[in-house]
Amino acid sequence: MPARNTALRYGYVAQSLHWVIVGLLIVQVTLGTIADDLPLGFEKLVTLARHKSFGITILGLAVIRLAWRWTNPPPPLPPMPRWQHLAANLNHWALYALLFAMPLSGWMMSSASNIPVSWFGFVQLPDLVGPDRAWKGRFLELHHFLAWCLYALAGLHVVAAIKHQFIDRDGLLMRMIPGRPR
């Protein structure tokens, strides 16, 4: 399989970035949910530190994914009604925006809480904002709101892919599945 996208399918670079980010998002939801349920203490702090590290990883991968997309356009969508084409493009760009906004809102929340953010303990990241309890609360609310937006848009993305695979039978889903073209 080629590294670059072709007219018929995504190359292995785009596919790898897509599926690694999907896997990390599942890890993030799990860690975030676990952290919310833990009492304040060592275990919660370790879980949140991992959540932040994976969030920064997703942010870095999103930068790479977007740069790859700009230099390596995706294959064209199969024929479909104009509104579906528009909805697909809006959904993709909204998902990209969330891949940036989610980690940044979490990073700003930590900064406003005066809690340092590091990447797996190797690199300490600078604060994005100064300590401020009110802003910490606002960034927390924003982070949770964006999470619900991500769930909704990712769910729509999955449902649309399944629709194209099993109802439209247009091969759209197979463009992002690793392996031989089908």
Task: Explain the meaning of each model-derived region.
Residues 1-182:
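Membrane-embedded alpha-helical bundles that constitute the cytochrome b-like, heme-associated redox core
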